[in-house]
Curated annotation (Swiss-Prot):
GO terms for cellular component: mitochondrial inner membrane; mitochondrial outer membrane; mitochondrion; nucleus. GO terms for biological process: mitochondrion organization. InterPro entries: LETM1-like_RBD (IPR033122), LETM1/MDM38-like (IPR044202). This is LETM1 domain-containing protein 1. Interacts with BRI3BP. Interacts (via C-terminal) with SMARCA4; the interaction regulates transcriptional expression of thermogenic genes in brown adipose tissue. Its main location: mitochondrion. PROSITE patterns: LETM1_RBD (PS51758). The gene is LETMD1. Residues 186-360 form the Letm1 RBD domain. It comes from Bos taurus. It is found in: Mitochondrion outer membrane; Nucleus; Mitochondrion inner membrane. One of its GO terms (molecular function) is ribosome binding.
């Protein structure tokens, strides 16, 4: 009764006569709806700002991949001749970017743990060595692209001269074989000159036994015989001091050796000697790391790349023969001291010139 009187009193003040029962029902409905509207939303139904950003990024990436796939199919269908170099170029950029990230991780790890280059595992050492050469070649293209509108000329030069201007990532499979054959033919041109210098220094060797060994080795090379490991190691003293030590090499000898190592010979004698020392030291360090790892742990491509770096044209030689040759090289290299690295430098010619299958 009291509640009904209050309701009638309020209705009278508001100027309308509303039955008390109806007012109570409406009031309860308003309270329930207010409770429903005012309740906090569940976190399960709505993502946080970070999750929203991640979902947006994943959506954009997915859409980009779809559009990119459609674009590739369009190019392959309507412009097949352009699609092949375009695909190789894009894959080359991806591989170069991946190499850069890996090299950065290796350098960061070296800096954190105070590791020197020669203390790295073989694969990391080889990756850094190759990446430095690739970056040097890419920097040359970058310098050419600096002038206004020069980038169009650079693209034309890259298309016309891929062997000279591009790194291996941007070569087709056929180009990789052809270009490696061309490079090996260029370094083979220096082999007769290097052997001729070895014959000329025979009278300058003071030890009669070493003179005989050098003469025998040169005779075997001229007859087309592949020398044994002990035949080469028997001459290590000749390459430690006069007349074939690294510091006793003449300018013409160093230029011929640079061509055999695929290094530019168009530098002053001081720079040629420094570059030969540096390059040979890096190969010697790689050999020590590879001996620890073991030739059997390398893949077929790694074996062929290692042989090619050391003077053997491995593109046309069976994998097992490449492994055998690389084992002979490591046997010689790991037996040498730092003062005898001139022998390792000449070994690029001595061990590869008459190997079975390398005469191409």
């Amino acid at each position: 009764m009291a509640l009904s009187r209050v309701c009638w009193a309020r209705a009278a003040l508001w100027g309308s006569a509303v039955p008390p029962g109806l007012y109570v029902v409406r009031r309860l409905q308003f309270v329930r709806s207010g409770l429903t509207w005012g309740a906090p939303r569940s976190s399960k139904l709505h993502l946080s700002p970070k999750a929203d950003v991640k979902s947006l990024i994943s959506y954009v990436v997915t859409k980009t991949k779809v559009i990119n796939g459609k674009y590739h199919r369009f190019l392959g269908r309507h412009f097949p001749r352009f699609y092949v170099p375009y695909t190789i170029f894009m894959k080359g950029l991806q591989m170069l970017w991946a190499d850069g990230k890996k090299a950065r991780r290796i350098k960061t790890n070296m800096w954190k743990h105070n590791i020197k280059f020669h203390q790295l595992p073989y694969r990391e050492m080889e990756h850094l060595r190759q990446f430095r050469r690739d970056v040097t070649k890419c920097l040359f293209l970058g310098i050419l692209s600096i002038p206004p509108f020069a980038n169009y000329l650079v693209f034309l030069l890259m298309y016309l001269f891929p062997r000279q201007l591009l790194i291996r990532h941007f070569w087709t499979p056929k180009q990789q074989i052809d270009f490696l054959d061309i490079y090996h033919a260029l370094r083979k041109q220096s082999h007769p000159e290097i052997l001729c210098y070895l014959e000329k220094v025979v009278p300058l060797i003071s030890d009669a036994g070493l003179q005989w060994h050098m003469t025998e080795l040169c005779t075997k090379m001229q007859r087309g015989t592949h020398p044994a490991v002990h035949d080469i190691l028997a001459l290590r003293e000749c390459f430690a001091n006069h007349p074939l030590g690294m510091d006793q090499l003449r300018a013409l000898q160093m230029k011929a050796l640079c061509r055999a190592m695929l290094l530019t010979p168009y530098l002053p004698s001081v720079l040629l000697r420094h570059r030969l020392k540096t390059h040979t030291t890096v190969i010697h360090q790689l050999d020590k790391a590879l001996a620890k790892l073991g030739v059997g742990q390398l893949t077929a491509q790694e074996v062929k790349s290692a042989c090619y770096l050391r003077g053997l044209n491995s593109t046309h030689i069976a994998e097992e023969r490449c492994r055998t040759w690389l084992g002979e090289w490591l046997q010689i290299s790991c037996s040498l001291k730092e003062t005898e690295l001139s022998l390792l430098l000449h070994n690029v010619v001595l061990l590869s010139i008459n190997y079975v299958g390398s005469r191409r």
